Every structure is written in C-alpha cells, then in structure tokens.
Regions:
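Short linear sequence motif anchored by a di-proline
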Residues: 1-172
Length: 172
C-alpha cells in the first residue's frame, strides 16, 4: 500500500488523492483508488464542496478513508500542520461519489467541531479515524456517533510550517 502523506486542504481541485474503500464490485475486498477531492460542481451551482458536516447526518453507504500523516490549515498568511500527539498516522472519514460524465470518482471529507488544540485556529476539522477504527468505519459496524466525535484535548500537536512538510515514512 501507499505511505500516508500530509492532507493539504489547499490542494488544487484537479489533484487526485488516494482513498481506501470497499470495492463496489466485491464488497469483501478493500481497494485503494485515486479520487478527486470535492463534489461534482454540476449539481451545486458550479461550486465543488469538499467537506460535509457530520452533525445530523448519517453515512450508511460509500464510506471511505483518506490516509494522512497530518493535515494542514491556513490562518491568514500562516500555515500550520496538525498531527497526532503520538506521531502515528490516521485516516480522515470521508464519503465517495461515483464518476459521472466528465467528473471523476470523487470524495468529500466529513468534519466535526474542532478539538481544543485546533479550535484556536478554526472551528472545524476532518473527522479522525484511528488505525484501530478503520474497519469499523468502512463496515458500518459501530454507531457513527461513536466514530465521528471531536477528539479530546491533547490529541494533536499544532506546529507552524516554516518550510515544506516534515514527516517520517509510514506504512499502512
């Protein structure tokens, strides 16, 4: 499999990212595929929505995971990296949408209210799925409310990015 990389919320719309999902042709099989981050703008007045709020919604189908070693956020002219306190990689909970006409396979990241470390910079962040929870998310085997939660305090380390992302190589 692939090495998790920083999840860059400023990535250009045309950039394809890797997601992990159940193979729609064989639900027993997991697959890693490339997908565009953002919904088809054809169905939303020309806007591609990259996020979907967790509150009040259920996601019974088309769940996927975005492997990440950290995520980035921009506040004013500064950019920050956010990574798990223990240095481990994680997944962002997401839902995928099939390719339609000229729009490729795509996904949207599910968001939750920001935890204390991130809330100093922004109100929300992607829902974090830990490695031990990945199959629970993909298989819908536990209530969504147990997985799509705001992480507790001291879950993240937030660092200002002064030049390119730094990370160790991690294996899936």
């Amino acid at each position: 499999m692939s090495t998790p990389t920083p999840f860059d919320s400023e990535a250009p719309l045309e950039k394809l990212l890797r997601i992990i999902r159940r193979n729609p042709d064989d639900m027993q099989e997991l697959e890693m595929v490339e997908a565009r981050w953002g919904s088809n703008p054809r169905f939303s007045d020309g806007t591609s929505f990259r996020f979907v709020r967790a509150e009040g919604k259920t996601f019974p189908k088309q769940r996927c995971l975005v492997p990440a070693s950290e995520f980035h956020m921009t506040v004013g002219d500064k950019q920050y990296r956010v990574k798990l306190d223990d240095g481990n990689f994680f997944y962002l909970a997401a839902v995928w949408e099939p390719a339609i006409a000229e729009w490729p396979l795509s996904f949207r990241v599910i968001t939750v209210a920001a935890n204390p470390e991130v809330s100093r910079y922004q109100d929300r962040h992607g829902a974090i799925i830990l490695r031990r929870q990945r199959m629970q998310w993909l298989d819908n085997s536990v209530p969504e409310s147990d997985l799509l939660e705001t992480p507790p305090a001291r879950t993240f380390i937030v660092e200002e990015i002064t030049r390119g992302p730094r990370q160790k190589a991690l294996a899936l």
